[in-house]
Amino acid sequence: MSNFLPTALKYRPTTFQQVIGHDVSKRIMINSILMDRQIKCMLVSGIRGIGKTTLGRLYAKSVNCDNFTEDVCNMCPSCVEALNGSHPDIIEIDSASNNGVDFVRELVEILRQAPLYKKRVIIFDECHMMTPQAQAALLKVLEEPPHENLSFILVTTNPVKLENTIRSRCLPIPLSQLKPAEIAQNLLNILQKEGYEADPDILHTLSIQGGGSLRDVQQMLDQLILAAGGTCKLDSKDLRAAFGILSVDEYKRLAATLNSKDIRGSINAVSDWVSDGMDLTLLYETGVPTLLRDFSVVLSGAYTDKISLYSGLSADLIKNRLQLSLKDVKVFFEIWENVFPMLKGANRPEVVWQLFLVRLFQD
């Protein structure tokens, strides 16, 4: 039987040092332990797949670690039980399934017992799924904890759905989206450990597809490896086969043809991609809007190091060679809006692309 583990599980951090980004949040958790200032309740929030539950588990493991300095040791009996998922004092609850008031009341009875190790930590995953009655019962527990060596970690993608009275009793730990560069470096590290190679532009392209979610991108990496088969070198063809999206180099090729209004070059580029299995619907849905957005960012003077160019084009390349104006981009976008509906249900989508180019360059 296969021992395959998805990348997101295989490379899930087991120490604070392994967690990508979230430096301030990690420092708050670490300092609370070093300074012996127990956090009775924290609210960890953010989009899916950025490490909310992972950080909650690490904090729970840390407060019970026998050798904690700046990080967990992963060697003491408490850490070993936590790694095995059998720690008696770390209770993780799926609030989507256990969201009723009766469950919270039953939990309170369990919490009255003293922890076997140092602290008992309760992690409520997706806590916003709890019913109003369950939240009211939880509030009473937060106000009057049944035991002093007790901490609660509320994890959610939607904190506004929690009652204000609960939020007011929590230390907020908001997690931001991860930067594409951070995600790309993580993918590179994983590929090196797994014995794969990939062009940097492919890693950059993948890293921006997940919208800042590391788990989503790691799942895409698994799909990309499967699409590549036994090949150890991942290239742009694998990217198109798996997702129908363009790599950075292909964005550059498309940008050059749009910038110079080269209809032949645009048609040839798309013909090459279609022959490699690209879904033109995705090109319309993501490729063209992405480029138009990046053109607008640079032409408007809004580009800074903090604003990513989703296509992966460098600002200098666009500034030096961009012949378009903001008015041109506006016209391009209006034509794209008019032509895009024609693509759905089209028997020959490449003809719709050619129509788009003709209208684009004639105007």
Q: In which residue ranges do the predicted regions lie?
A:
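Extended, largely alpha-helical regulatory/partner-binding modules appended to the mid-to-C-terminal parts
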Residues: 151, 155, 171, 175-363
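P-loop/Walker A NTP-binding region and its immediately flanking N-terminal helices
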Residues: 1-178, 182, 188-190, 200-201, ...
